[in-house]
A protein has these predicted regions:
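Long amphipathic alpha-helical segments
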Residues: 89-158
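Acidic, proline/glycine-rich low-complexity IDRs
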Residues: 33, 138-141, 149, 153-205
C-alpha cells in the first residue's frame, strides 16, 4: 500500500529533488501510527492524483484523436467522481477562500480545445440543469463547457496542493469538495451520457 501511494505522489510532483522531499513527507505521514492530516490521507492523495491526470490530459487534448478523447473521459471522469465521493469531509482552517489559479484565458483555451475536438458533437440536450425550472423543453448544453468547469476546479486544487502548505492544501481540498457537491459533480455526471452515446456511435462507424 505504501509503495502504491509513493508511486502516485512521485508522479504528481514530477520527481524533482525539492518535490521529492515533500512527497517523502507525505509518505512518512501515511506510514505514521498517528492519524495523518486530512491532506495526507490516502483518499485525498488518490483524488488529487486523478485530478492531476485529468488536467494534464485536457491541456494536451489537441495531440489526441477524437475517439481517444472520448474513451479517456469515460475512464477518468467516473474515476474522479468515485474518488470525490470517497473523500471524507474536512474542515476549513483559514479565513477566506483558497487562491484561484486558472485564468479566464486558460479556461477558454481548454474549452476551445475540447470544442474543436468534438466539433458538432459538442452540443447535447440536457434536462438536469438549473435553468430547466424555467423551461418545459430540454436545454442545449456543451460537453466542452462542462468539462472546462470541472478542469477549473480541480486545476485550482492541484495548484494549491503544490504550495506544500498544509492549511492551504486543506482549505483547497475542502473548497473543491464543496464545489463538487454544489455543481461540478452534477456536470460530470451530465456529460457522461452524451460521451457514452458518442463512444457507441464511433464503434458503429
Amino acid at each position: 500500500m505504501v509503495l502504491k501511494i509513493r508511486a502516485k505522489l512521485l508522479f504528481f510532483f514530477h520527481i524533482s529533488k525539492k518535490k521529492r522531499t515533500f512527497a517523502n513527507k507525505l509518505i512518512r505521514n501515511t506510514m505514521s501510527s498517528t492519524p495523518a492530516h486530512y491532506v495526507y490521507q490516502e483518499p485525498a492523495i488518490e483524488f488529487v492524483t486523478v485530478a492531476v491526470q485529468l488536467c494534464l490530459y485536457l491541456e494536451q487534448v489537441a495531440e489526441h484523436e477524437k475517439s481517444d478523447f472520448i474513451e479517456k473521459m469515460l475512464c477518468l471522469l467516473p474515476l474522479l467522481y468515485l474518488k470525490a465521493r470517497l473523500l471524507p469531509k474536512g474542515t476549513e482552517e483559514m479565513d477566506g477562500y483558497p487562491e484561484r489559479f486558472v485564468t479566464e484565458q486558460e479556461y477558454e483555451d481548454v474549452r476551445q480545445l475540447i470544442a474543436q475536438q468534438l466539433g458538432s458533437d459538442d452540443a447535447y440536450l440536457e434536462v438536469f440543469m438549473e435553468d430547466m425550472r424555467y423551461s418545459d423543453e430540454p436545454i442545449t448544453a456543451f460537453i466542452s463547457e462542462n468539462i472546462a468547469d470541472i478542469y477549473q476546479e480541480v486545476k485550482d486544487l492541484a495548484c494549491n496542493y503544490q504550495t506544500r502548505e498544509e492549511t492551504i492544501m486543506n482549505d483547497a481540498l475542502v473548497s473543491c469538495l464543496e464545489a463538487f457537491e454544489q455543481h461540478w459533480g452534477q456536470k460530470l455526471l451530465n456529460v457522461l451520457r452524451p460521451l457514452h452515446a458518442l463512444s457507441l456511435t464511433l464503434i458503429d462507424e
